[in-house]
Design a protein with these regions (language model features):
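Short, polar/acidic, helix-capping and beta-turn segments at strand->helix junctions
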Residues: 1-131
């Protein structure tokens, strides 16, 4: 594969600015920050549900590029309350299983909308499915 492919997915929340959900260049994939907005536009009030929805959105974007969870090499999680990391860690562990990507957690004062509590972005290398 050569060139750059951009993915603007119909089953994802509409971007709030000028970007796409994922970009693939060769075997590298960048997944834009995604939040816990359901396809119907609703937002769960609970951080755990928001993270579950965000992870589902991230996974669908990853799979649209041909990737799988084990291809993810780096994640960044942005939390309004960093103490919520203990609540969302079981979801991460269930998603990644034995695979452990590099990870950064950042506490932030706000996201794009006041009801949002968590956002996740990731990078993947599609031929990196083995540890």
């Amino acid at each position: 594969m050569t060139g750059i492919e951009r993915y603007l997915l119909k089953d994802q929340p509409e971007p709030v600015s000028h970007y796409c959900h994922a970009v693939r260049a060769g075997d590298r994939v960048w997944l834009s920050g995604t939040v816990g907005i359901r396809p119907d536009g609703s937002v769960p009030s609970d951080v755990v549900e928001q993270f579950e929805v965000a992870m589902d959105n991230l996974d669908r974007a990853l799979r649209a590029t041909g990737g799988r969870p084990e291809n993810i090499v780096k994640v960044q999680v942005f939390l309004i309350d960093v103490n919520d990391r203990e609540k969302i860690n079981p979801i991460r562990q269930a998603y990644f299983g034995e695979h452990r990507p590099a990870s950064t957690l950042v506490g932030i004062p706000a996201l794009v909308s006041p009801e949002l509590k968590v956002e996740i972005e990731a990078e993947a290398i599609l031929d990196s499915g083995t540890d």
